[in-house]
Structure formats: C-alpha cells, structure tokens
C-alpha cells in the first residue's frame, strides 16, 4: 500500500510539473510582449494552480468557437461590400493634411478603404446635450436604429432614451440594441429588456458572462464600443456609456463621469454601419450589411465637410490596428500633442513614443483623472509618471470628477476621438472604435474642450512627485509589474 501511495505521489508531482512546463512553453511560444510574458510566468510560478487557471481563462485572446466561426464566415461578404463601397468614389478623400497623411495611409492599407469626406461633425461634451440630441434624432427616425454600448444603466435621462426607442419601434422603425453582458448587468436585471422586446426592439446580450464557459472563451474580452446609427445617415460615437452620471456609480467616490461624444451626419455612418454589422453577426449569426451611401442625401460639400476615418479593433478586425494608429499619430506630432484618458497604462512602445515626442521638442500634455474608479489602474498608471516627467511631458490631474473622455489632438489638426483607453485592454483586447478626423476646425473645438479640462486640473510638480513616500513607490512598482494584464 505504501508503494501505491508513493507511485501516486510521484505521478501527481510529475503531472503537476508537466502542466507547469506545458503552460510555460505555451506562453513562450505565443511570442507575446516580454513584460506580459514575464508577468504571467511569475503568477504561474508563485500561485501555480490559480495562475494556470487564470492564464487559461484570461491569458490568451480567444473569442470562442462559435463566434470565431461566424467572424471567419462573414469576411467574404464583408469584403464584397467594401469592394462595392469603393465604387462610390465621391465619398472618399484623395488627399490629407501633412500631419494626417501617415495615419490615413496606414488605415487605408490595413483596413482597405480611405477616409470619407463630406461629413457634418459636432462635438458634444455634456451628458444632457448628448442624450437630448439623441432623443431628438430617435424621434425623427424613419427606418432603422442600431445601438451598441458597453454599459446601459437605467435612470435619469437614460430612461427618456429608452422610452423614445420603444416609441420608435412601435411606429415601425427597426431597432436593434447590442449590450455587453458584464457592463450592462444592471440593465439585464431590470424590467427594461422585457419591455423593449415587447415593444419590438431586438435586444441582444453580447459576450455573456458564464463561469462554465471560462475555458472556452476569454471572459474579460468585452464589447466596449459605443455606437448609435439612425437611418444609415446619423451616427454617434465617443466615450459615453448609456448612463446619466447623476445616477451612475454615486458611491464610487470619484465624482460624476465626464465624457465626450461626436454626432455625425454623412457617409461616415456607412463605415460605422459595417462595424456594427460585423458585431451583430458575430453575436447573433444574422447578416445586416448596411446599404451604400445615398448621394441624394449627402448635402455637404467637400469644402465644408469633415474627413473622417473609422478604426475598429477586436477579434475579426486587423490586429494591433489601434495600437499602430496611436503610435503613428504620436510620431507625426511636430508642435503639440494633447492626450486625455481615464486609464493610463501604456505599452512600452507607446510610452517611449510619447517620451520621445517630448524630447524632440513637441509640447506634450497628458490629462488623467486625479481619482479613479479602478484602484489597480490608479497605482499602475502612477508608475509611469517619473519617466514621463523626466522626458518633459506635462501631466495634468483632473479634479472635476472622473474624466472618462478619450481623445488625442496632434498639432491642432489631427484628432482621435472614441472609446479607446490608453491601457492594454483597449490596445490589445476589447472591441473598440476610434474616429480619426483631419480638420483644423474640429481640432480647434477639441482643443477648447481640452483647455477646459486643463483649467480644472492640477499640474503635477516634478519636485513634489519625487518626494512622495516610499510606500507609494513600492505600491506603484508592485502594480506596474501587473500592468500588462490590466
């Protein structure tokens, strides 16, 4: 009997180390970034079983077999649609400003289409303005309304949006609503899903959270886009979830959330429409390709319209596109670079690009919230401040609430506005969307908003920063080590 237990013990030890070795080899063979690989290896060797379970659940980007098959199956029809869209020559920009040209070239070659011109673009910087404008557009809708949001939380003005959406469905407008399962969990526990479905709205819970499927699909892969499409002509996107900040996370201790959204009219709605169509098909298996732009309803001349490129990321879309776009934008800066983000945990490449821009004389400013709803991100982001300050980057800490806006402005001409945070999850993992706008008029509008953020912020002083307590430094480095996983 003793021999039997000895054999079992040795087999258990052998199996344990074989499992460790197998996962280690898998991490090394994935050719991931060195900091990310080192972080996972440390977790696995310090907390072996927990680390292995965590890696198999969250360490690799896998969409799940069914969704992956749908993503693969939809590409031929999407490619044909893009080919047909290219025949609408009148909507595409043939030239861009000097600072924007490299980024637009990257997008055209990786995504297959140029930026579209002739769009009317409005920057909305308050929740009231955004939700009231959205209600007006929904009330005027005649054919279709499509929405995707990470968070939809009932309360306040959001309920007016829900009521107007249900009224639109009752009068015959085809309404589709795609909401992330994790972000919108309060919505799916409320009476609204049943009410909306009874009104005729197609409500879909995207990327359902299910502990029994954690090894079949990565659970922290989230649908983080915020898109509204109305009649294939009016569109919204930006940083704002479908929440009223007066009713959202009031107990978080960070103040009201501050966001920005872009409202668009014109052919850019078509390119946003194909992104939505891909998301809808991946989640439901149903194909809803948008119609091509109607030349009869494009009243804006090239001279007065905005040129916009849409960048989408996530499984099924060009890999590392968002990351490459940000790097290209930063390296294009010659005079000024202003970035706003609630979560600043950049890749090494992006950090070095920002520091290099400052070191070659570009006026670089980063605006982040002083208080953050994520304790881990709050400490991890501070681990980058010393290197940024030493390079000459100005860091502003926003004190008027949780600054949730995501924007980049390069030389007053090239703007990036959307859902992308400057962290690993947005850069490498989630379904995200970003608008690239080549227009000095819109750049001036964005600069005015960023100046307002700066006026409500405190500039981080380098000398005071260097005198922070030792325990702060230790905590920062601890969370910095796990930054590739945040």
Curated annotation (Swiss-Prot):
Q: Which SUPFAM superfamilies match?
A: Phospholipase D/nuclease
What keywords would UniProt list here?
Answer: Cell inner membrane, Cell membrane, Lipid biosynthesis, Lipid metabolism, Membrane, Phospholipid biosynthesis, Phospholipid metabolism, Repeat, Transferase, Transmembrane, Transmembrane helix
Biological processes annotated in GO: cardiolipin biosynthetic process
Q: What is this protein called?
A: Cardiolipin synthase A
Question: One of this protein's Pfam families, by short name?
Answer: PLDc_N
Q: Which GO terms describe its molecular function?
A: cardiolipin synthase activity
Q: Give the EC number.
A: 2.7.8.-
GO terms under cellular component = plasma membrane
Role this protein plays: Catalyzes the reversible phosphatidyl group transfer from one phosphatidylglycerol molecule to another to form cardiolipin (CL) (diphosphatidylglycerol) and glycerol.
Question: Where is this chain primarily localised?
Answer: membrane
The record's section on CDD domains has:
PLDc_EcCLS_like_1, PLDc_EcCLS_like_2
Q: Which family does it belong to?
A: Belongs to the phospholipase D family. Cardiolipin synthase subfamily. ClsA sub-subfamily.
Q: Where are the transmembrane segments?
A: 3-23, 38-58
| InterPro entries to which the protein is assigned, alphabetical | Cardiolipin_synthase, CL_synthase_A, CLS_N, PLD-like_dom, PLipase_D/transphosphatidylase
Write out the catalysed reaction: 2 a 1,2-diacyl-sn-glycero-3-phospho-(1'-sn-glycerol) = a cardiolipin + glycerol
Keyword Plastid in the entry? The reply is no
Q: Which organism is it from?
A: Yersinia pseudotuberculosis serotype IB (strain PB1/+)
Do you know which Gene3D superfamilies this protein is assigned to?
Endonuclease Chain A
**Membrane topology per record:** Multi-pass membrane protein
Any idea which residues are catalytic in this one? 224, 226, 231, 404, 406, 411
Limits of the PLD phosphodiesterase domain: 219-246, 399-426
Location comes to: Cell inner membrane
């Amino acid at each position: 009997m003793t021999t039997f237990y000895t054999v079992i013990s040795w087999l258990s030890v052998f199996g344990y180390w074989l499992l460790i070795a197998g996962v280690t080899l898998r991490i090394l063979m994935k050719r991931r970034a060195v900091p990310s690989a080192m972080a996972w290896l440390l977790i696995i060797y310090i907390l072996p079983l927990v680390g292995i379970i965590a890696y198999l659940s969250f360490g690799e980007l896998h969409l799940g077999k069914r969704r992956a098959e749908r993503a693969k199956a939809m590409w031929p029809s999407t490619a044909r649609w893009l080919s047909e869209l290219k025949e609408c020559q009148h909507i595409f920009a043939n030239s861009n400003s000097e600072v924007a040209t490299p980024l637009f070239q990257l997008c055209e070659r990786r995504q297959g289409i140029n930026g579209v011109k002739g769009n009317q673009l409005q920057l909305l910087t308050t929740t009231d303005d955004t939700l009231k404008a959205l209600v007006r557009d929904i009330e005027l809708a005649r054919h279709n309304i499509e929405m995707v949001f990470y968070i939809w939380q009932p309360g306040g003005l959001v309920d007016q949006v829900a009521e107007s959406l249900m009224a639109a469905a009752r009068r015959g407008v085809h309404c589709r609503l795609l909401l992330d399962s994790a972000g919108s969990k309060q919505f799916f526990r409320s009476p609204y899903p049943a009410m909306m479905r009874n009104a005729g709205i197609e409500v879909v819970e995207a990327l359902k959270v299910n502990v029994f499927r954690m090894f079949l699909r990565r659970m922290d892969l989230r649908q983080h886009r915020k898109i509204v499409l109305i009649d294939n002509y009016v569109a919204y996107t930006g940083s704002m979830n479908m929440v009223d900040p007066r009713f959202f996370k009031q107990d978080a201790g960070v103040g009201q959330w501050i966001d920005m959204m872009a409202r668009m009219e014109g052919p850019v709605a078509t390119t946003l429409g194909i992104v939505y169509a891909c998301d809808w098909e991946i989640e439901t298996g149903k194909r809803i390709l948008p119609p091509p732009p109607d030349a009869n309803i494009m009243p804006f001349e090239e001279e007065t319209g905005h040129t916009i490129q849409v960048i989408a990321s996530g499984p099924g879309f060009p890999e590392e596109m968002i990351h490459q776009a940000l790097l290209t934008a930063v390296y294009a800066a010659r005079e000024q670079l202003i970035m706003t983000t609630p979560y600043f945990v950049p890749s090494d490449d992006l950090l070095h690009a920002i520091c290099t821009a400052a070191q070659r004389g570009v006026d670089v400013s980063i605006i982040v919230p002083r208080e953050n709803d994520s304790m881990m991100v709050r400490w991890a982001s501070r681990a980058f401040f010393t290197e940024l300050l030493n390079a000459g980057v100005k860091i502003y800490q926003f004190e008027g609430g949780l600054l949730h806006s995501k924007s980049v402005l390069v030389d007053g001409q090239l703007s990036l506005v959307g859902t992308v945070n400057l962290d690993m999850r947005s850069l490498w993992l989630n379904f995200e969307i970003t608008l690239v706008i080549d227009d000095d008029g819109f750049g001036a509008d964005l600069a005015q908003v960023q100046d307002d953020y700066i006026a409500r912020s405190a500039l981080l002083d380098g000398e005071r920063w260097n005198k922070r307590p030792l325990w702060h430094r230790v905590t920062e480095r601890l969370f910095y080590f796990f930054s590739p996983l945040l």
